[in-house]
Every structure is written in C-alpha cells, then in structure tokens.
C-alpha cells in the first residue's frame, strides 16, 4: 500500500477479489445519485457529497424493437418514412430509427423513449407491463403495427437532468477525487463532454 494513493478493489462474478493500487486520483463520472451514495458511504471529501443534494433527475423507460423481416428485396423500411421525431403522445416523448444511422446494420430497429412524467408514474411497474404499453403507444405514433421479432425495455432511473448542478465539475485536490457528468450542466451529451473536459483540465 502506498500512502496517499488510491486503491481500487474489484469483485468478479465468480467471487474473486483483486486490488489495484497506486492511483493519484479517483474521478466519478456516474449519475449524481450514485456518486452521492458512494461519497456518503465514506468519510472522503464530505463537501463534495453536500454539493450534490441540489441535483435532480427524471427517469426514463426506453423501448427497443427490431424487425429483421424488413430486410428483403423491395422492402427497405417499415412504418413511417421519417427517422426521428419528438412526440406529444402521453406515453412516448421521442422515437428514432436506429437503423438509419451511418454504419448500422440494415435491420429495421427503433428506440422509443417514454416521457419523464409517464416514466416516473410507472417507475415500479413490471417490465413486461411497461413493454406492452409502450409497444401499443409506439404503434400509435409510427403507424408500424407489425409484430417485432425482438422487443425489450430498459429503465434509467436518472436519465434526464431536471435541475443541474450549475457548474462544470467538482474537484477536491487535497483528497484527489472529482465528479463530472451531464448533470453538472444539463442533460445533453454536449454537457457531459464539457464537464469531463473541464474536470480533466482541473486535474491536470
């Protein structure tokens, strides 16, 4: 063990333990709620944990569907001719055709994100129930009523920041621990990039 240096303890799925040592700093680039829980479970940098209390985030149920049977001669897509749209449907806020993106396999695939309000209201619902409701809503939004070959849902508890930290990062030089994420400045990928860059510059 090296005095003043960080150690990382890992636990594998088969129960094996490893210790990695000699790190100058720890940077937590995770949701604010998870970072807060980690900091509160230790006595390191209590001031950083206190700064996270103001951050708020909304959940999101996300539906992913695939239609491999669309890949056949004379049929390139199913459903609408647009590739992405915001929605005013009470369940779904955003839909995107993943297979339209550059470099993607030619298998008709869509992602649909439920609205923050609906996701919050149904946060404790069983995934199968959520999937059935979102499939129905997806068909109503897109007009695509063919049964998908694959469908699954994923729940993100901290998907979209509703009240950001208001600064690009948090960094405690004495403890050697820093925090950053999109939740520092907003909820977009650009916010995550800027937060990470600013933290890296502070550490350097």
Q: Which stretches of residues belong to each language-model region?
A:
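Short FAD-binding loop at a beta-strand-to-alpha-helix junction that anchors the flavin cofactor
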Residues: 111, 168-200
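Flavin (FAD/FMN) cofactor-binding core of flavoprotein oxidoreductases
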Residues: 132-175
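Central helical "cap/lid" subdomain
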Residues: 16-79, 144-146
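Conserved beta-strand-loop-beta-strand element in the redox core of flavoprotein oxidoreductases
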Residues: 1-21
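Active-site-proximal substrate-binding core of FAD-dependent oxidoreductases
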Residues: 202-204
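A short, glycine/Asx- and small/polar-enriched loop/turn
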Residues: 1-6, 106, 161-163
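Active-site substrate-recognition segment that forms the wall
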Residues: 64-72, 76-123, 129, 133-142
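Short glycine-/small-residue-rich Rossmann-like dinucleotide-binding loops
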Residues: 12, 31-32, 116
